[in-house]
A protein has these predicted regions:
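Beta-rich carbohydrate-recognition and catalytic domains
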Residues: 1-172, 177-221, 235-284, 307-357, ...
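Beta-rich accessory regions
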Residues: 10-16, 264-496
Length: 496
């Protein structure tokens, strides 16, 4: 049903999209139709297509009252833009339709579950001068194009939060269905002492929900508010993914501020007990937040994330007509105690001619025939020997601009550095990552698009993601070593 606010957003979106050329967008990373985007939402399979919704403020390239944007794809790579599907207009979501998820119902409808942020009438303003709001969980149903909010929203309110929890910070439902016939949802909730916990709810019909238990909690460790939870099993291991705010650093494992971590363990579906065994970073780069996953019809767990970070997102480059993009969708597996991430295999269908260099000795800055470009899929295998001190890849480069991927062989530290990439703000521009060789090698699969680099380290056992704003003419790639390096390179331009 096209309400007045929704219709206004759709008309604005269609008009402003005409002002953005394809040359201004990345080739294969999702962007919003116009305006601002952040968290991926409603990542699901419905009517023979993959659906991706997203947090969306169409009216500017800054964060604002959240709508839901919408795209579909047959292969995770080429996406079709559909009209915005939700606008903040009801009493329970007039301050924003916040993040949520989606699932197909048995009757064929597409069910969306999201957080409504509503202004509390008569409550005045908070310490920041903003209206006092509360967060509740809401439903909408649709046919893949148009969606209608459930007439009895909200379906879970602050009254359904167990003792000790906040009614203000209660959001980001992730829905799925179990073999027992129930829909389940994990929802994050801040506790009165400023920590976070992940609550589990269930419903027989998708609309009437009951509280079940606490899945896990931060307990004054691993940050404060755990945003955007995801909960699933992969390769026999139960995974809880959260995006903590106010994270404290721990060596090179966890970095300060907003992060994404995954907790591994076991889960008893009868007692709904999750026993945590380990905690690891999900991505160790600069720009990665709020991932959401889905299960494909062929049984793959596929994840996508907002390719940005909240501290950096406040600094929007001058002249851009939209802001925010998503990572390439990643296949997730569990092996040797870690989540393994790789770009979805469908990306290989877009590869052009193969360029191969094997066992190349590098001692000084070197260019190699056929190795340059900005839209590519390149794997570099570095032999780590006693003769190697450090090795550097310089990409998206010319005389003025460059981004760097460097490896210190003695410290076993990989560094990504975009300080010369053209992102001209005093924000985080580099990150150090502990990376040990595997069988004497460090392997880097590098995905480049017009405005980003995604690095899959040692067959995806670690990843590092960063956004760059470098003129497209800067397309040189060079290799340099201190000491002596031996590398092999396989590179494909990506053709669209």
């Amino acid at each position: 049903m096209n309400t007045e606010k929704l219709q206004k957003a759709r008309e604005f979106e269609q008009e402003q999209m005409k002002k953005i050329s394809s040359e201004e967008r990345p080739f294969y990373h999702v962007t919003g139709s116009v305006g601002w985007i952040n968290d991926p939402n409603g990542f699901s399979y419905y009517k023979d297509e993959y659906h991706l919704f997203y947090q969306y403020h169409p009216y500017s390239n800054q964060w604002g009252p959240m709508h839901w944007g919408h795209l579909t794809s047959k292969d995770f790579i080429s996406w079709k833009r559909l009209p915005v599907i939700m606008a903040p207009e009801e009493s329970y979501d007039n301050a924003g339709c916040f993040s949520g998820s989606a699932i197909e119902m048995e009757d064929g409808r597409h069910l969306l579950m999201y957080t409504g942020v509503g202004i509390v009438k008569g409550a005045g303003v908070n310490e920041n001068g903003d209206p006092v709001t509360h967060q509740t969980q809401c439903m909408a149903v649709g046919d893949g194009t148009d969606y209608v909010k459930y007439e009895k929203n909200p379906v879970i309110t602050g009254n359904d939060v167990p003792e000790g929890g906040s009614k203000v910070d209660f959001r980001d439902p992730k829905i799925w269905k179990e073999e027992d016939g129930f829909y389940y949802s994990v929802i994050t909730n801040m506790t009165e002492d400023g920590n976070s916990r992940i609550l589990l709810y269930r419903s027989k019909d998708g609309f009437k929900w009951e509280y079940v238990t606490v899945i896990d909690h931060s307990d004054e460790k691993l940050g404060k508010m755990w945003e955007c939870p995801d909960f699933y099993e992969v390769d026999g291991k139960q995974i809880l993914v959260v995006s903590p705010m106010a994270m404290l650093p721990e060596g090179l494992k966890f970095h300060v501020g907003h992060s994404v971590i995954y907790l591994t363990g076991s889960y008893d579906k009868t007692t709904h007990t999750f026993v945590r065994e380990d905690v690891q970073p999900l991505d160790s780069g600069i720009d990665f937040y709020a991932p959401q996953s889905m299960l494909t019809p062929d049984g793959r767990r596929v994840m996508i994330a907002w390719m940005q970070a909240w501290p950096n997102s406040k600094f929007v480059p001058d002249g851009v007509k939209f802001f925010g993009q998503m990572t390439v969708p990643r296949e997730i597996n569990y092996r040797n105690g870690k989540l393994i991430q790789q770009p979805v295999r469908e990306l290989e269908n877009y590869r052009g001619e193969r360029v191969l260099h094997e066992n190349v000795e590098i001692t000084e800055e070197t260019t190699l025939e056929g190795i340059r470009g900005r839209v590519l899929d390149m794997t570099v295998k570095l032999n780590v020997t006693d003769e190697l001190k450090s090795f550097t890849i310089k990409a998206a480069a010319d005389e003025k601009y460059a981004s760097f991927i460097s490896y210190d062989a003695k410290k076993e530290v990989l560094t990504i550095d975009r300080s010369r990439s053209g992102y001209l703000y005093d924000i985080l521009h580099s990150r150090d990552i502990q990376v040990s060789p595997v069988d004497g090698k460090v392997t880097l699969r590098i995905l480049m698009d017009r405005f980003s680099m995604e690095i899959f380290i040692n067959d995806g056992s670690q990843t590092a993601t960063m956004v760059i704003f470098t003129p497209q003419e800067a397309d040189e790639i060079t290799f340099q070593a201190e000491g002596k390096a031996e590398i092999s390179i396989e590179k494909y331009d990506l053709i669209f």
